[in-house]
Structures are given as C-alpha cells and as structure tokens.
Design a protein with these regions (language model features):
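PRPP-associated nucleotide enzymes
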Residues: 1-183
C-alpha cells in the first residue's frame, strides 16, 4: 500500500477508540498489572513491533520494578492475514529462568503468535508468564484456553490499526484505534 492508498483508507476508516479512551484504559491496566505482580521486579517483555507503543505508555504508569526485554516475532510480514509460520526475528536478551515474565502486546486476535510466545517463555524456565494487551478482538477464532491477564479495550472483528497496530506497515503511531472501512 503506497502513501496515497493509505491516506484514502484512513479517510474512510472508523474511529474505534480515541486517545482519551486509550489513556483511561492504560491507567486501569497499570493498576491491574501492579496488583497482579506486586512490587516486582518483573521481566517486562515488549512484543515487537506492535507492542512498542503500548508497552512504553504503560511502563510510565507502573509502580512495580521492571527489567525491560523484548522479543520480535511475526506471522504477518506486512499482510493483513497471518500465516501458519512464526518467524523469530529476535529472541529475548535476558535470562527468563525463574523470573516472572509479562508479555506486552498491542492486540490479542486469534492468538497464535502470543500462544507460541507463552510456550517459549515456559520453555525458557519462566516462573510465571502474564499476558497484557491493549486490545482484545471480539470473535470466536481464538486459540483454545488463551486469554490475556490484563486487557485495555475490546475491538470489533475488523481490521484495526493505530496505537502500535499497523495497516500495511503504516499507521502504528496514530493516537487512536481505527478500523478499515468494511466492504
């Protein structure tokens, strides 16, 4: 998608959540996560690239001690539908053995990527693994028994972007959550 096509898609996109709704959700998420993990320290692992915006904004609201880490995996590679293949671009840099790990991502959709990351965290010896997502998509296609421990907002079963989520690798920096026009 070139710049003109993205701007056209943006012009017809629906606003799902504005910045005020996101800020309120992040405040609530921080309180919930602080209550779940106590004082820390926790491994605060950002799921790149989508989780970057959310994790940064959420971190400034947390009171617990954070040891920052990141993982970079992808099933999408610029497409709107994920493949069955999980590409590990960069694994964690910290040792997760006997640590409480919190994975932070932009959205819980079907959950294949996040489920694989949770399994990988357990294989690396994590004492506990929590999942935090800004958004949870409302549908019935999720991986069985997968849920986020902390969720900020729900979004409809549409292609959403903004606040870390992209539409054809564009729009991650937008200060709201949008959905591509249907049809």
């Amino acid at each position: 998608m070139n710049e003109q096509e993205f701007l056209a898609a943006m012009a017809s996109a629906d606003v799902i959540h504005d910045q005020a709704a996101i800020d309120a959700a992040l405040d609530r998420m921080a309180s919930e996560l602080d209550a779940l993990v106590g004082g820390g320290p926790i491994v605060y692992a950002v799921v790149l690239t989508g989780g970057l915006v959310v994790a940064g904004q959420l971190a400034t609201r947390l009171r617990c001690e954070l040891d920052f880490d990141y993982v970079h995996v992808s099933r999408y590679r610029g497409e709107t539908q994920g493949s069955d293949r999980l590409d590990w671009i960069c694994g964690p840099r910290l040792d997760w053995r006997d640590r409480d790990v919190v994975l932070v991502d932009d959205i819980l959709d079907e959950g294949h990527t996040l489920s694989a990351l949770i399994d990988a965290a357990h294989q690396r010896g994590a004492r506990s693994v929590r999942l935090v997502t800004l958004c949870e998509k409302l549908h019935d296609r999720r991986v069985a028994n997968l849920h986020a421990d902390v969720v900020g907002l729900t979004v409809p079963d549409r292609f959403v972007f903004g606040y870390g989520m992209d539409a054809y690798e564009r729009g991650r920096q937008l200060p709201g959550i949008y959905a591509l026009a249907e049809g």
